[in-house]
């Protein structure tokens, strides 16, 4: 709903005081919202670098090549930059998805199980990158996770759900 892909059955979705259903608002709002999910595939025939260039150009990112290099360095992807995403491990794909989501320095970052496919050390490293990014850029993070340690580390406020209903 926050991305405008699904209409709410009741009520409205407002981001920064603007109704996402209003066509005039939607494009401007979505330029500063990004999303990561283990269920969203990256284009398999493009390299990591090509994937990031596509997303960077879509968002009109300035100094794109420097931004791509910085993100690949931060996420330990430089040595794989010419590898096609279809050849990557799930953990590497996860880090490419994170780089893609951070490329436009979003105001809001929606994270669906951002470290689910990562080993503990890489997961911890990715959480550190997310924390640092959010604190440096003032980004709001909305996190869906079954990992309560991750929730405690990344979230200042927590809402628990069960069967689609808020319970806490």
Q: Model features per residue range: what roles?
A:
Residues 84-88:
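Conserved ABC ATPase signature
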Residues 11-22, 29:
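Conserved ABC transporter NBD signature motif
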Residues 124-136:
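Helical segment within the ABC ATPase nucleotide-binding domain
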Residues 3:
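Helix-to-loop junction immediately C-terminal to a conserved catalytic motif
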Residues 53, 57-80:
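Conserved ABC ATPase "signature" region
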Residues 109-112:
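Catalytic Walker B motif of ABC-type/P-loop ATPase nucleotide-binding domains
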């Amino acid at each position: 709903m926050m991305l405008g892909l699904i209409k709410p059955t009741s009520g409205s979705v407002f981001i920064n005081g603007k109704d996402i259903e209003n066509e005039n608002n939607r494009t401007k709002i979505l330029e500063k919202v990004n999303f990561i999910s283990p269920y969203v595939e990256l284009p398999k025939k493009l390299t990591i670098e090509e994937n990031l260039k596509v997303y960077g150009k879509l968002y009109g990112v300035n100094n794109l090549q420097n931004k791509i290099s910085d993100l690949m360095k931060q996420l330990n992807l430089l040595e794989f930059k010419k590898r096609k995403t279809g050849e990557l491990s799930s953990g590497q794909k996860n880090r490419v998805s994170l780089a893609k989501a951070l490329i436009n320095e979003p105001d809001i970052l929606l994270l669906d199980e951002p470290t689910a496919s990562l080993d503990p050390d890489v997961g911890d490293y990715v959480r550190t990158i997310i924390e640092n990014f959010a604190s440096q850029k003032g980004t709001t993070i909305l996190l869906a996770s079954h990992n309560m340690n991750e929730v405690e580390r990344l979230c200042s406020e927590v809402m628990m759900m069960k069967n689609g209903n808020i319970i806490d």
